[in-house]
Amino acid sequence: MLASTVTGAPLQEQGRAKVNLTLRVVGRRVDGYHDLESVVAFADCADQLTLVPGPELTLTTTGPLAAACGETSDNLVLKAARLLAESVPGLKLGAFELEKVLPVAAGIGGGSADAAAALRLLARLNGLSLDDPRLQAVALKTGADVPVCVPSRACTMTGVGENLQPLALPVLPCVMINPRVPVATKDVFQALGLKPGDLLVGVTDVLTAPSWPTAGASIGDWVSALDQVKNDLEPPALKVQPIIGTVLDALRASHGVLLARMSGSGATCFAIYGSEADAKAAGAQISADHPEWWVHAGTLS
């Protein structure tokens, strides 16, 4: 799908939080990367990225969690933009402004979502399709979670993150919690302890993986299916940061909860509820009990 814009007019995109409803680590490849199988959804909380077209590529960061972003030069927004400029001759660029509201190093792909938002903005500015193979290659080169964040739609994700298949996911009422403790993905995979060439999921497990509900399925149908597949990174993440267990306990003790687990490599955890009212009530109670935590009550889709 092609899009165009008036040069000079500010453009905006959201970097929506990515949530791994399931996450299986199939194994570690000989090149060191991990093969994954994941059901991914996106939340209704997001960073905001603005692009003002201009001659120079820059990035400024604002918002309540701007300080957690670290050095601007290392930001994935700039990495994605530079890689796309290398791949597309004459690419029009400009000044990015990132309003950062999502926790960093949190297992919800905040940096990847921001990079994907940058690619969507540059695609709009330059009349590129999001299916352009150059853009898709840049997304994967920027980071394993960036390809799934480009469309930001519910899907299954396999390989190192490059193989995507859309899913007909209903709107899932949810609460997301981050204890404001960063967890480095590399530390969690190190705690998992797979050597190159090792398998964690056997062939039989792969063949017996559940088929996901189709269009029209209920929240209950999805919870039943999701309950059959765990997050393989949850046990090693608990070793790296035990407070994740406290977060999960709080979610599992909340009224109306149907399923609670960790997203990605943590430390963010989420719970699914039968209604938005239950989710909002649970979020309010947990916020009152733990004012030091980042808590979002909303939906996944």
Curated annotation (Swiss-Prot):
Amino-acid positions noted as binding ATP in the UniProt annotation, renumbered to this chain: P103, V104, A105, A106, G107, I108, G109, G110, G111, S112, A113
Record-linked InterPro entries: GHMP_kinase_C_dom, GHMP_kinase_C_sf, GHMP_kinase_N_dom, IspE, Ribosomal_Su5_D2-typ_SF, Ribsml_uS5_D2-typ_fold_subgr
Gene Ontology process terms (BP): isopentenyl diphosphate biosynthetic process, methylerythritol 4-phosphate pathway; terpenoid biosynthetic process
Annotated Pfam families: GHMP_kinases_C, GHMP_kinases_N
Catalytic reaction(s) noted: 4-CDP-2-C-methyl-D-erythritol + ATP = 4-CDP-2-C-methyl-D-erythritol 2-phosphate + ADP + H(+)
GO molecular function: 4-(cytidine 5'-diphospho)-2-C-methyl-D-erythritol kinase activity; ATP binding
Enzyme class (EC, first level): transferase
Enzyme Commission number(s) from the entry: 2.7.1.148
Keywords: ATP-binding, Isoprene biosynthesis, Kinase, Nucleotide-binding, Transferase
Active site location: K18, D145
Metabolic or biological pathway, per its Swiss-Prot or TrEMBL entry: Isoprenoid biosynthesis; isopentenyl diphosphate biosynthesis via DXP pathway; isopentenyl diphosphate from 1-deoxy-D-xylulose 5-phosphate: step 3/6
Function: Catalyzes the phosphorylation of the position 2 hydroxy group of 4-diphosphocytidyl-2C-methyl-D-erythritol.
HAMAP family, per the entry: IspE
PANTHER family registered for this protein in UniProt: 4-DIPHOSPHOCYTIDYL-2-C-METHYL-D-ERYTHRITOL KINASE, CHLOROPLASTIC
Family designation: Belongs to the GHMP kinase family. IspE subfamily.
Name of the protein this chain belongs to: 4-diphosphocytidyl-2-C-methyl-D-erythritol kinase
Organism of this sequence: Bradyrhizobium sp. (strain BTAi1 / ATCC BAA-1182)
